[in-house]
């Protein structure tokens, strides 16, 4: 077996499959594009679903890739096991209706065992297969595999809901008896026992059925086109080929671990407690790649995952004695390890380091707050005479403050307290159940549509015309091809068309189809790409249509021009964002409609009003500069040399279209555009908002809509000016400010009067002191306007030694407000109010010295006051 670096393994994999006629699919962005079922790209096949379900027909049905992936369903196992990772690389080879079982197995065996390639010893390889899949068993035998090395497994059948499914065959490497101390042998495989002896290195999925949950597996229908989907973990291959005990001792992780050794002054011990080293090395890889791909730490979705990973890594750094920010210093090492195939980490290093460091600094402040929270919890336990920290409190520390359970346990035990592990597990399960319920159900490849996939007739979109005559090539009605149609809705394909099919954020054209008499025979309501790329017109049929007949196709010209204004303005906006807030502000989605444009982009904070003003000004400057817009067709490399921005998630063919707006903007784009930027007329941003962690959205209007937006603002300003009696519009702001200042003065004066009134009333309230259990208590109903007045009473009470405990109740509107304040350690205000609040049908809580509650039953106020003495 050859000893290869991870880069050599990856390259040899791709080279082998290229030699078998496969095209190399570049690794896609970790953030899925147009797939709401996935939080992250989590496998090599995840980006190829459109090929497998037939919605897009690939030029080459044989594909290979090395795909960066993230899975976060078992973060807690990372660092504990030899092979769990959050980010990993999946090597794959795929066949879309081309070769099948025989070639997949034969070529796979050749790659693994041939001296020209990986040169694995044959006697170290074991294969599992689905018991009913005798074809795979026989093919392995034909390759020279001993029957004793073939293990039937009932679970070797791949399916996720409806869609492509089939048996799979897995390949394992036997690391020998040293990794099997109990000498269990092949039972480890047959009974699926977790072990370190037989390492799964490759899985070959043989997709030959369309799974249907409504019928038994034996009744699944055969796919029109059978597919091959395989996955081999690079980290596992590297561990085997480099003789490493775990994945972490390979060249993918050890350089990071060495840097952590330098930062911590500790030494990594392969056989000792090395979990913190592993966690840090794994998590910084995921953070570096995910942030480089546009995901940013936040409080939900992908952002929450990244924040959790970063905080977990930071806490493990502290366990190694690293108390300052340090993770950002590891980004360079990650980039250097992966540079040969993933140069983007080094290219975006400054931005990634900035985000990681800023998040570390924020978390440092959070840790201080969390430590304070833990100290408060432990002090409360001491005051209450309890010896166990509750699971819900441990979970809050873990979930809100990012404290690993081990750290909480360590600190609590140092202080002499036990840990409620079961309560923590229960709280964790509740959160996981909520998360699962919120996930969009999906994952299936979807059923293949043979009718659409079977359209092979050529069709060409004509950019520079609004009307043309063309022959009708295909009619599909009720999901079947037909020669004619006279009513209902149908899908049409023409030899050529002026109708733009929805793509790249630009909506489809609408319009009409006319016969040779000039009569409208169909209304075009939508246009989408067919699997083989033809524009597929969805039409409402008004009169007879037949294949082979020529028709006149006319788009709605006014609508197209309005869409083009917004699309061209989107390109200007993208460039302006780069100039004003930074090149990290890359497109994360767009929509160019007739009435408005919507642009989503990566950014870690809200765009300030000043920045929005600069962006809007810059876009309008380019409009007024009347920049010529040109389009060029060329290859991708030439386009990039021209400075064209290629968007993540977009797949480009051999020939691409470059849209250039003067010297200001150059982008790869297949959409339609104006001839000159001046045709946009005017650009106005109407909204900027966050739509998820690390993603912002700008909604803007152009032309007539922009003018109307400005006019609406002017009308509103005129109305304000009239209300405040400003002689001119320019005086309105000063008038409003003067009114605001006057209002603030009145509010201040009113507050002072309230305080004086409260102080006067307090004198009467504080006279009535009772005693219970050696504690002096004041308990009274007061007449106040709001809950703030209760706090004012409490502030006055604190100034003098009126009593040890104060309980105030007020009926304000339909609600009852309760306040408890305590000056003595013997009475916990928060606990006391939890007992009192239910009496008035309320609830609340607070700190040991101050707590408040709200209720709804004012008839029970007297009962509450009577119960005060008993609750002390």
Swiss-Prot record:
Its cofactor is Zn(2+). SMART domains: tRNA_SAD (SM00863). Keywords: Aminoacyl-tRNA synthetase, ATP-binding, Cytoplasm, Ligase, Metal-binding, Nucleotide-binding, Protein biosynthesis, RNA-binding, tRNA-binding, Zinc. Binds 1 zinc ion per subunit. It is an enzyme of class 6 (ligase). GO terms for molecular function: alanine-tRNA ligase activity; aminoacyl-tRNA deacylase activity; ATP binding; catalytic activity, acting on a protein; transferase activity; tRNA binding; zinc ion binding. It comes from the Bacteria. Consists of three domains; the N-terminal catalytic domain, the editing domain and the C-terminal C-Ala domain. The editing domain removes incorrectly charged amino acids, while the C-Ala domain, along with tRNA(Ala), serves as a bridge to cooperatively bring together the editing and aminoacylation centers thus stimulating deacylation of misacylated tRNAs. Belongs to the class-II aminoacyl-tRNA synthetase family. This is Alanine--tRNA ligase. It comes from Streptococcus pyogenes serotype M5 (strain Manfredo).
């Amino acid at each position: 077996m050859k000893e290869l670096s991870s880069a050599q393994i990856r390259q040899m994999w791709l080279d082998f499959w290229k030699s078998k006629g496969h095209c190399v699919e570049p690794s896609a962005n970790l953030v899925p594009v147009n797939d709401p079922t996935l939080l992250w790209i989590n496998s090599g096949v995840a980006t190829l679903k459109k090929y497998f379900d037939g919605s897009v027909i690939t030029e080459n049905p044989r594909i290979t890739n090395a795909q960066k992936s993230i899975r976060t369903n078992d973060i807690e196992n990372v660092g504990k096991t030899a092979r769990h990772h959050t980010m990993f690389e999946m090597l794959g080879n795929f066949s879309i209706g081309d070769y099948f079982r025989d070639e997949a197995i034969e070529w796979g065996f050749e790659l693994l065992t041939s001296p020209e390639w990986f040169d694995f010893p044959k006697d170290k390889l074991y294969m599992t297969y689905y018991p009913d899949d005798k074809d795979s068993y026989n093919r392995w035998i034909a390759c020279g595999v001993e029957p004793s090395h073939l293990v039937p497994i009932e679970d070797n059948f791949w399916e996720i809901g409806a869609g492509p499914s089939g048996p799979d065959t897995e390949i394992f490497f036997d690391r020998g008896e040293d990794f099997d101390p109990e000498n269990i042998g092949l039972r480890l495989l047959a009974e699926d026992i977790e072990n370190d002896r037989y390492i799964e290195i490759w899985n070959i999925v043989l997709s030959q059925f369309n799974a249907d949950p409504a019928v038994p597996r034996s009744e699944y229908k055969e796919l029109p086109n059978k597919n091959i989907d395989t996955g081999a973990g690079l980290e596992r291959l590297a561990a085997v080929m480099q003789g490493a005990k775990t994945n972490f001792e390979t060249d993918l992780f050890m350089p990071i671990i060495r840097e952590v050794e330098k930062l911590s002054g500790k030494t990594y011990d392969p056989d000792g407690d090395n979990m913190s080293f592993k966690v840090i090395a794994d998590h910084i890889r995921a953070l570096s790649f995910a942030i480089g791909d546009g995901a940013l730490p936040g409080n939900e979705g992908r952002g929450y995952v990244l924040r959790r990973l970063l905080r977990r890594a930071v806490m493990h750094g502290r366990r190694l004695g690293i108390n300052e920010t340090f993770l950002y210093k590891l980004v360079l090492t990650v980039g250097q390890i992966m540079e040969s195939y993933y140069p983007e980490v080094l290219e975006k290093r400054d931005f990634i380091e900035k985000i990681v460091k800023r998040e570390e600094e924020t978390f440092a402040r959070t840790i201080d707050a969390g430590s304070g929270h833990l100290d408060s919890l432990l002090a409360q336990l001491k005051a209450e005479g309890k010896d166990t920290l509750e699971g819900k409190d441990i979970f809050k520390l873990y979930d809100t403050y990012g404290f690993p359970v081990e750290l909480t346990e360590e600190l609590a035990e140092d202080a002499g307290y036990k840990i409620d592990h079961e309560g923590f597990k229960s709280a964790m399960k509740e959160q996981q159940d909520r998360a699962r319920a919120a996930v969009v159900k999906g994952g299936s490849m979807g059923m293949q549509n043979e009718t659409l996939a079977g359209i092979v007739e050529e069709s060409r979109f004509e950019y520079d015309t609004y009307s043309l005559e063309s022959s009708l090539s295909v009619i599909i009605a009720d999901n079947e091809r037909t020669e004619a149609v006279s009513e209902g809705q149908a899908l049409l394909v023409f030899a050529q068309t002026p109708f733009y099919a929805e793509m790249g954020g630009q909506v489809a054209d609408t319009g009409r189809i006319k016969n040779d008499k000039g009569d409208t025979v169909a209304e075009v309501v939508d246009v989408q790409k067919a699997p083989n790329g033809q524009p597929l017109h969805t039409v409402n049929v008004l009169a007879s249509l037949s294949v082979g007949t020529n028709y006149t196709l006319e788009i709605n010209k006014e609508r197209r021009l309005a869409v083009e204004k917004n699309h061209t303005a989107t390109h200007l906006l993208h460039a302006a964002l780069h100039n004003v807030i930074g090149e990290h502000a890359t497109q994360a989605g767009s929509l160019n409609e007739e009435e408005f444009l919507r642009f989503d982009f990566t950014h870690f904070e809200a765009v300030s009003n000043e920045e929005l003003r600069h962006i809007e000004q810059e876009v309008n400057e380019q409009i007024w500069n009347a920049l010529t817009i040109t389009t060029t067709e060329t290859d991708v490399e030439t386009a990039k040399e021209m400075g064209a921005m290629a968007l993540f998630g977009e797949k480009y063919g051999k020939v691409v279209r470059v849209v250039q707006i003067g010297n200001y903007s150059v982008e790869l784009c297949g959409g339609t555009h104006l001839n000159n930027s001046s045709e946009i007329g005017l650009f106005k941003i109407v909204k900027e908002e966050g739509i998820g962690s690390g993603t912002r959205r700008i909604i803007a209007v152009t032309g007539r809509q922009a003018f109307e937006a400005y006019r609406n603002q002017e009308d509103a300003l005129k109305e304000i000016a009239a209300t405040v009696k400003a002689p001119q519009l320019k005086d309105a702001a000063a008038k409003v400010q003067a009114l605001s200042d006057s209002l603030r003065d009145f509010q201040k004066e009113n507050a002072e009067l309230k305080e004086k009134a409260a102080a006067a009333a307090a004198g009467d309230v504080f006279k009535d002191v009772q005693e219970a259990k050696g504690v002096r208590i004041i308990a009274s109903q007061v007449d106040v306007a709001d809950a703030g007045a209760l706090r004012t009473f409490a502030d006055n009470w604190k100034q003098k030694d009126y009593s040890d405990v104060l309980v105030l109740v007020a009926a304000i509107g339909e609600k009852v407000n309760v306040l408890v304040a305590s000056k003595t350690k013997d009475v916990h205000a928060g606990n006391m109010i939890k007992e009192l609040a239910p009496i008035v049908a309320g609830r609340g809580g607070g700190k040991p010295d101050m707590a408040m509650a709200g209720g709804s039953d004012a008839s029970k106020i007297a009962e509450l006051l009577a119960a005060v003495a008993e609750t002390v």
